[in-house]
């Protein structure tokens, strides 16, 4: 099968970007690329293997200034529309090679970044509505960039806290202990972990106050969510690791319960064998469920997306950028180091941790999708073209691995719009506006083209064709997690589900029973890979406490003398993850 025609997929994208960059929000900061430069960058991107992280981002904007002493400074915005990630290139006149630094804008809605001082003393210019800051972190006897790099922190502050230097750190368990020791040795415990990290290491510049937003009545939302389509509704002893409102005597299967001290978050529990015969007996959609799967507990969490923003970060190691071992033959080009022509994101840095500027708003985190080695096809048509369809991903407006048509995709746009769908060629026109995206396999549930009802995807019953993978001993039924999008009366809900053991068929039937419009697989095989935690709002608590969907997930967090430091928010991790922030 031939490769997808890249130019056809991106027709009109240059014009789309030109209109987007002309918006008033980009009146300051680096000048957008000219039409000529944009066309050159797009041509580079449209090759089968762009070959570098810069070539993968055709909407990037660059600015270069030169000092009177020969110092050359270049600033690259990977996506001016999103205004979050920058690469700083510094080359002294007598240097053997330039130095590169990955910078992150701590508040993209406020700060616009550019360079000044051309022909004199170069500096970074950081402009806000009523403020401007000039800084040259490469200058002086003890350059701020060197000091920030020596901290060993995943995010080190620069320029009075307006920028972060993203540092390379390890996401291993050994490094978690090292970070915990660093915290113990350098901090007097007695504040919350949020203040510990933000106040002591990142200074008060990162503390933010959020106005309260109008919250829907929990009872009304529970009523709107309704009950799952089950044949029976027994009260179950099983329950998630959250404190729930009204569940003191147990949880009724298929019903929703508000999570205590976590507005906008709800939980449910069931077993696939309880699903109504109306769904289970529909022929030709899924495989039959065996007795083990029918009686296995499923724990679900629903997020009212009117109250949350969704984000995504890569881990320090996963997903990686080289080839999966799965594609072969026509699905693999041995002449290039990875499916996009590179096997490293350098000079960008993936650090597996939530930005400290977002800690006071974080409501939940959960692990992302497959590692790169599992995230491509070994069998079926998808294995034979488009380099085996390695799952794509995009962070902070920066495309890190190409998004392929036909793959299940979670995405967020620049205006906060959240979606979950099968990616299409036409959707590539959204690329300049994408803030986050993650692909993982194919649809478990997608809308029926005639009725709009959520029905199992075409490849749910195909083990190889759907790239569903399995347990260590190649069993299709194993511990799995998935997510779904459901819309109720114009209100979007993101559902995350933990299946103690399930096949794709059992997952699809469960999401059908809960009325999902679209659903996709996340990760599988261990509680570490299916980790999910909430962070309730408790005013008098001096820690950021994590409550886990399943109690065993707490073992992944880092223990300290004052309590557990949660994964993804308190230390770097080697796996990618999603996070939900309370809207400001």
Q: Which role fits each region the language model picked out?
A:
Residues 27-399:
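Zymogen propeptides
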Residues 2-14:
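Bacterial N-terminal signal peptides that target proteins for export
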Residues 12-22:
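Bacterial N-terminal signal peptides
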Residues 431, 444-445, 455-458, 468-584:
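Extended C-terminal subregions enriched in glycine
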Residues 7, 24-26:
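Non-catalytic N-terminal targeting/anchoring module and adjacent flexible stem/linker
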Residues 314, 319-500, 504-512:
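Aspartyl protease catalytic domain
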């Amino acid at each position: 099968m031939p490769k997808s025609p890249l130019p056809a997929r991106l027709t009109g994208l240059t014009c789309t970007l030109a209109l987007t960059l002309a918006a008033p929000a980009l009146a300051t900061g680096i000048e957008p690329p000219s039409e000529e430069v944009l066309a050159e960058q797009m041509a580079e991107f449209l090759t089968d293997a762009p070959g570098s992280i810069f070539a993968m981002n055709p909407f990037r904007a660059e600015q270069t200034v030169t000092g009177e002493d020969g110092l050359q400074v270049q600033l690259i915005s990977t996506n001016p529309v999103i205004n979050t990630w920058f690469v700083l290139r510094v080359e002294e006149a007598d240097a053997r090679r330039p130095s590169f630094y990955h910078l992150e804008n701590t508040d993209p809605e406020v700060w616009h970044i550019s360079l000044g001082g051309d022909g004199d003393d170069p500096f970074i210019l950081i402009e806000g509505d009523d403020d401007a800051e000039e800084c040259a972190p490469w200058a002086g006897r003890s350059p701020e960039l060197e000091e920030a790099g020596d901290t060993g922190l995943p995010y080190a502050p620069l320029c009075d806290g307006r920028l972060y230097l993203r540092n390379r750190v390890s996401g291993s368990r050994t490094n978690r202990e090292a970070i915990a020791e660093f915290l113990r040795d350098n901090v007097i415990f007695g504040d919350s972990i949020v203040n510990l990290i933000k106040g002591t290491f990142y200074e008060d510049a990162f503390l933010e106050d959020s106005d309260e937003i109008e919250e829907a009545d929990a009872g009304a939302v529970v009523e709107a969510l309704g009950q799952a389509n089950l044949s029976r509704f027994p009260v179950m002893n099983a329950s998630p690791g959250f404190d729930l409102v009204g569940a003191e005597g147990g949880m009724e299967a298929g019903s929703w319960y508000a999570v205590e001290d976590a507005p906008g978050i709800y939980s449910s529990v069931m077993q696939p064998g309880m699903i109504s015969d109306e769904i289970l007996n529909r022929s030709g959609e899924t495989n039959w469920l065996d007795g083990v799967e029918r009686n296995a507990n499923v724990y679900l969490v629903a997020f009212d997306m009117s109250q949350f923003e969704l984000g995504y970060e890569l881990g320090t190691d996963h997903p990686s950028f080289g080839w999966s071992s799965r594609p072969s033959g026509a699905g693999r080009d041995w002449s290039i180091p990875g499916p996009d022509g590179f096997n490293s994101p350098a000079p960008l840095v993936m650090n597996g941790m939530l930005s400290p500027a977002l800690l006071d708003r974080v409501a939940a985190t959960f692990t992302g999708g497959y590692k790169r080695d599992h995230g491509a096809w070994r069998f079926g048509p998808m294995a034979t073209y488009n380099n085996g369809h390695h799952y794509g991903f995009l962070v902070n407006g920066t495309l890190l691995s190409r998004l392929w048509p036909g793959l299940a995709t979670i995405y967020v746009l620049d205006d906060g719009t959240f979606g979950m769908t099968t990616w299409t060629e036409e959707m590539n026109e959204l690329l300049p506006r994408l803030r986050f995206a993650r692909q993982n396999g194919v649809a478990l549930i997608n809308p029926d083209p005639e009725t709009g009802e959520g029905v199992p995807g075409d490849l749910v019953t195909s083990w190889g064709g759907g790239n569903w993978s399995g347990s260590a001993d190649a069993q299709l039924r194993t511990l799995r997690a998935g997510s779904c999008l459901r819309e109720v009366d114009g209100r979007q809900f993101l559902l995350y589900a933990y299946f103690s053991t399930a096949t794709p068929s059992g997952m699809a039937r469960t999401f059908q029973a809960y009325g999902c419009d679209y659903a996709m697989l996340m990760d599988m095989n261990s509680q570490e890979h299916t980790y999910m935690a909430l962070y309730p709002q408790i005013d008098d608590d001096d820690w950021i406490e994590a409550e886990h969907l399943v109690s065993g997930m707490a073992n992944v967090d880092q223990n300290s003398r004052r309590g557990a430091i949660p994964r993804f928010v308190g230390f770097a991790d080697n796996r990618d993850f999603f996070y939900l922030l309370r809207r400001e």
